[in-house]
From Swiss-Prot:
Pfam families (alphabetical): Ribosomal_L5, Ribosomal_L5_C
Organism of origin: Idiomarina loihiensis (strain ATCC BAA-735 / DSM 15497 / L2-TR)
Protein name stated in the entry: Large ribosomal subunit protein uL5
Functional summary from the UniProt entry: This is one of the proteins that bind and probably mediate the attachment of the 5S RNA into the large ribosomal subunit, where it forms part of the central protuberance. In the 70S ribosome it contacts protein S13 of the 30S subunit (bridge B1b), connecting the 2 subunits; this bridge is implicated in subunit movement. Contacts the P site tRNA; the 5S rRNA and some of its associated proteins might help stabilize positioning of ribosome-bound tRNAs.
Self-association and partners: Part of the 50S ribosomal subunit; part of the 5S rRNA/L5/L18/L25 subcomplex. Contacts the 5S rRNA and the P site tRNA. Forms a bridge to the 30S subunit in the 70S ribosome.
GO cellular-component term (any): ribonucleoprotein complex
């Protein structure tokens, strides 16, 4: 069992129940899933670029990513419908808690010129999205084997009803939000 999951049940749940005065433990917000997405526009010219991105995302998440394809053709970007343009992975359960632990304790502190996470990146329904400019902040990615520094999007989906509840949930996990 992940340490962060135990921490959630033992510390975060009672803290949030008291703060928001919930009647039941089931009302307390929880993290449902974490989605990692890597858009690789250069994959149109060179197919190996997408293979390298898939390998990086697999190392970061510990799970095989799915390749995403263009939904419709866009002449301005020289993209046709069905072209592979990225990859994504959805983490749930044990892998989600392990990734969240590594994100908070290892990856976020390794971000260059880091001044805190943007507290306005909530979507209005309690989900938080953040972008990472370099995949090399994760220790699983071998720096010598990286062909190009790419970023990725991280979306944390919660079942919180409001942004305030979700912010309190993530702050309880020691997410370093900007003041």
């Amino acid at each position: 069992m992940a340490k962060l999951h135990d921490f959630y049940r033992e510390s975060v749940v009672p803290e949030l129940m008291k703060e928001f005065s919930y009647n039941s433990v089931m009302q307390v917000p929880r993290i449902d899933k974490i989605t990692l997405n890597m858009g690789v526009g250069e994959a149109l010219a060179d197919k190996k670029v997408l293979d390298n991105a898939v390998a990086d995302l697999e190392a970061i998440s510990g799970q095989k990513p799915i390749r995403t394809v263009a939904r419709k053709s866009v002449a301005g970007f020289k993209v046709r419908e069905g072209f592979p343009i990225g990859c994504k992975v959805t983490l749930r359960g044990e892998r989600m808690w392990d990734f969240l632990q590594r994100l908070i304790s290892i990856a976020i502190p390794r971000i260059r010129d880091f001044r805190g996470l943007n507290p306005k990146s909530f979507d209005g329904r309690g989900n938080y999205s953040m972008g990472v400019r370099e995949q090399i902040i994760f220790p699983e990615v071998d720096y010598d084997k990286v062909d190009k520094v790419r970023g990725l999007d991280i979306t944390i989906t919660t079942n919180a009803g409001t942004d305030d509840e979700a912010r309190a949930l993530l702050a309880a996990f020691n997410f370093p939000f900007r003041k």
